[in-house]
Amino acid sequence: MTQPNPKKSCGLTIKATGRNNHIVDYETWQEFLFISDVHFDASKCDRELLDDHLRQAQKKGAAVFIFGDWFDLMQGKWDPRGNYSDLRPEYKSINYLDAVIDDTIEYLTKYKDIIRFLGRGNHETNVEKRMHTSPLDRVAAVLRERGGDCHVGGYTGWLQFGEL
């Protein structure tokens, strides 16, 4: 999927200069929340703590960057690491992958103005390899449709903080 055009949001602008390279430009003091390994759909994800951190970021106008493994997505029959007993009850359905992506979209929509970057982790790249779909690109596209400015990055890469 294509990256969005640079747009100012949360006091900053992000421009993709390649799949794994982004320039983050801001004119004034900017706060950031950097998180990773959320494993949102895992039964052990501490969603109360996640909500607390995202609400704090929202209150401060901080830009949120999520660096890999937002998703767990290990409970499909195609993943040898899966364990059905670890599956959250709301995802026990025939369309497991879609249910998790839809739930993520619903959850992150309330934070669409501060979620600025989603980076791929091994859980996302595993789904891309086995299922030929990108959950993060799907989420980011909907957040942009709803007025956000979310960029997707690769498994590795660079963020350059400075002028565009």
Where are these regions (language model features)?
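Short, acidic/polar N-cap/turn motifs at the starts of alpha helices
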Residues: 154-158
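Short, intrinsically disordered, charge-balanced linker/junction segments flanking boundaries
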Residues: 159-164
